A protein has these predicted regions:
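Acidic/His- and Gly-rich active-site-bordering loop/insert found
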Residues: 2-111, 132
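Metal-dependent amide/peptide-bond hydrolase catalytic core
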Residues: 3, 20, 38, 91, ...
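Short glycine-aspartate micro-motif
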Residues: 82, 108, 168-172, 194, ...
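Short beta-strand segments
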Residues: 84-85, 144-146, 171-174, 198, ...
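A structural preference for long, well-packed, hydrophobic secondary-structure segments
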Residues: 91, 97-101, 107-141, 343, ...
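Glycine/charged-rich beta-loop-alpha catalytic/anionic-binding loops adjacent to active sites
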Residues: 99-113, 198-201, 322, 362
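Short, conserved micro-motifs enriched in small and acidic residues
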Residues: 108-121, 150, 212-215, 367-374
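Acidic/histidine-rich catalytic neighborhood of metal-dependent amide-processing enzymes
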Residues: 114-186, 230, 392-394
Length: 394
């Protein structure tokens, strides 16, 4: 296994060098071309599929997004296996210069290296590794690398759900922990709430009483709705974006607030939406109007029996090499594409085949643990061989 570390680090270095923020279409096009080239070199039939956000998306509103790369190869086995990861990262263009690829002890640093360049590197490494092992006892091997996961998979989610209904097993390569190695059987559902308040403008000095301050009403609604969350039940609502006013001496006539919502189950979102719609009926500023939109961005991943069989098999594979692998069966606030794959699954879905790391979605330098690399290609290839040949039943 140790001989896989340096080649995989070399792949990571090339991937990290290409900035691929979610709205950086040029960078995403460069990276998707590289990924397509690597998959074609491994004998996969590759499609580069353009994506677009739906017009009703509260933030993206029909925007063109980065393209997905989808590759397939037929084998002689019994089951179809799909590996998924995402090439886009949360950071904006130009931040790569502040976080170049470097290795310091057991830490390999780089922009997006943990979320999810490490996962992409593992997938690109696992496919030729299967060839080296001479293994083709799968009915079909599929790879999907999308480019919009960090913005809710607005253009790729439906396609991932379709593939989940066609493949016997879906392996998702998000990061596999930090202090401990694990695989996941649960992720949170995610929603976007947008609240638009309309009031009436007036001069802030001479006639503020004639205005209807949309900012005041927005503040009232935001503070009031904070208490609708329930951390003990995994329901979180956090207002993260606010826009109002343009001129200092004018009472603002409009205001917009956007919230990020996380829940353990899809039904929790239904209850929260109903509570929010009831809450906005209680207004502080008379003669203001409030428009609320509640967009379900990502479903929850809820494991089925097949997923649990896969998780236990992953533990057994780790035990073969004398290592421990935890199974996380409770969502902790993060959402992933495993949820889309698990909406109408043909078989099992398992999350977190990626590398252990730290710093994703934060101001800290992002890194993966070099010591976490060696077991992961072994886990991925063993899972493909066990599943593809029909060695697991559920």
């Amino acid at each position: 296994m140790a001989q896989q570390v340096q080649p995989l680090l070399a792949r990571l270095k090339k991937l990290v060098a290409i900035e691929s923020g979610s709205r950086d279409l040029e960078g995403l096009a460069t990276l998707s071309a590289l990924i397509a080239q690597r998959l074609q070199a491994s004998g996969l039939a590759v499609q580069v599929l353009p994506t677009q956000a739906p017009g009703f998306h509260p933030q993206l509103k029909g925007a063109r997004l980065g393209s997905m790369v989808y590759g397939t190869r037929s084998g002689a086995g019994q089951r179809k296996v799909l590996m998924i990861a995402h090439m886009n990262i949360v950071y904006t263009q130009g931040m790569g210069a502040k976080q170049p690829f470097r290795i310091d002890g057991d830490k390999a640093y780089g922009l997006g290296i943990s979320d999810d360049k490490g996962g992409v590197a593992l997938v690109l490494h696992a496919v030729p590794l299967l060839d080296q092992l001479g293994f083709k006892d799968y009915a079909q091997l599929g790879v999907l690398i999308n480019a919009d996961e960090e913005i809710g998979s607005a253009g790729s989610g439906a396609f991932i759900t379709q593939l989940g209904s066609e493949y016997d097993v879906v392996m998702s390569f998000e990061g596999g922990g930090f202090t401990e190695d694990y695989v996941r059987l649960a992720t949170s559902s995610i929603a976007i709430v947008e609240m638009k308040i309309t009031g009436n403008a007036s001069h802030a000095g001479s006639s503020p009483e004639r205005g209807r301050n949309a900012l005041y009403e927005m503040a009232h609604q935001v503070l009031k709705s904070r208490h609708l969350g329930d951390d003990a039940k995994g329901l979180k609502i956090n207002w993260t974006v606010g826009n109002t006013g343009e001129t200092r001496n004018v009472i603002p006539a409009s205001a917009t607030a956007i919230a990020d919502v996380r829940a353990l189950g899809n039904e929790d979102l239904d209850r929260l939406e109903a509570q929010l719609r009831e809450s906005i009926k209680d207004k502080r500023i008379a003669d203001t109007t409030i428009e609320l939109s509640f967009y379900r961005s990502r479903p929850a991943f809820v494991a089925n029996a097949a997923s649990r069989v896969l998780a236990r098999r992953a533990q057994d594979i780790y035990a073969e090499i004398g290592q421990k692998l935890d199974i996380r069966d409770r969502a902790t606030g993060g959402g992933t594409d495993a949820a889309f794959a698990g909406l109408r699954p043909k078989g099992g879905v398992l999350e977190s085949f990626g590398l252990r790391g730290f710093g994703a979605h934060s101001s800290d330098d992002e890194y993966i643990l070099v010591s976490s690399i060696a077991p992961r290609p072994y886990l991925a290839t063993r899972m493909v061989t066990d599943v593809g040949s029909g060695g697991l039943s559920w």
